[in-house]
């Protein structure tokens, strides 16, 4: 039986070829779904209506200057501050840090 780990200076390491490799291909963001998007400088909430390699087009979009407690905002949909766009906005994918599906009504009232 082949040994799958090695210990060096008291630290146990796993051999790379002993771990199952999973290839992931495709998109994780889908047109027609609502997302909370965090970029390097701003946060947005909106419905994705267009998507290409460089940009995301959001409908019923809002800029979120302050989400409040992050996990509470995602769980309840309650945001500390909301600045709605009149309709759409474009977010550059190059500035994207992360995004989460927004499972609540999109905020459309300034707060």
List the predicted regions and their residue ranges.
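Conserved RNA-binding domains used in RNP assembly and mRNA/RNA metabolism
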Residues: 4-11, 16-111
